[in-house]
Amino acid sequence: AVLFPGQGSQQVGMGAELFEARPDLLGSAADDLLGWSLRSVCLEGPQSELTRTDRAQPALFAVAYALWDEFARLLGEARPSAAAGHSLGEYTALAAAGVVDYFTGLRVVAERGRAMADAAARRPSGMAALLGCDLETAEMIARVRRDDGGSLWVANVNAPGQMVLAGAEEDLEWLVTHGSELGARRVTRLNVAGAFHSPLMASATDELRESLHTVAAALPSFPVWANVTARPSMVSEVRDLLARQVESPVRFSDSLEDMAATVDAFVHVGPGDVTAALARRSTSGREVLVVNDLSSAAVVAEYLQQEIG
């Protein structure tokens, strides 16, 4: 199975060799669609520019897809039996499976980034990771705050013992103060500028639904697990699931556990190695590999061909 990262994996310098290898995907056509220089933002930054939600999302989608396309070429006849992506990464997974074409995906992801940034700007908000905390405890903590009039929800189910909550700024301050006494081993604020995957993103859902309305979805060449349901998405429901995703919890750990029933290896494709770490924590007895540049793509492709052969 192939796994694609989401927002937070962006780093200045990512994809440097891909900009040389794949100008068809990362060159002027992408810049014209986005209205800004993908190469400049990815390679020159600064990091504060690349971290902006409306920049990070299309940049990560483009670089991860270009890397996937090179990796797929190196794989030859070998093909994944499944795919998933964390949040934004679900779009990369769908493009990799041929459900949407690359430039359509890039357009929708750019609109998604703008819509989520706009929603976040309406109210100071953010996210925090709870470590050493199961889903039941995380939901209880969020419910305690909501029962007291607050705005706090479970946003990511990343791995056993790793949950993420999203909420308004004052609710996150409350969480940092009271999280430990309510059952979390540690509470860590995340460097994101919004309460993603929570009801505070409702306006982004509405905008995204409009953007997705014109998107034609094709049959996937391999199944893609949806964040909202933690099961393979059907073509007829792809647009609805993607619209709902921005204000629904990312059930990534559940997806990995479900996929592990039918796959024996996970391959992270894209900048960083976040989904590989989550796969190691969420499954056991499965090989986990990382493709985050062209050299690792060549090594992993050769290894997988030998294993399959």
Regions found by a protein language model. Give the residues of each.
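Gly/Ser-rich oxyanion-binding loop with an adjacent helix/lid
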Residues: Q57-A129
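Short glycine-aspartate micro-motif
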Residues: A1, A83-G85, G105, V154, ...
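A short small-residue
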Residues: L43-L50, T92-A93, R186-L190
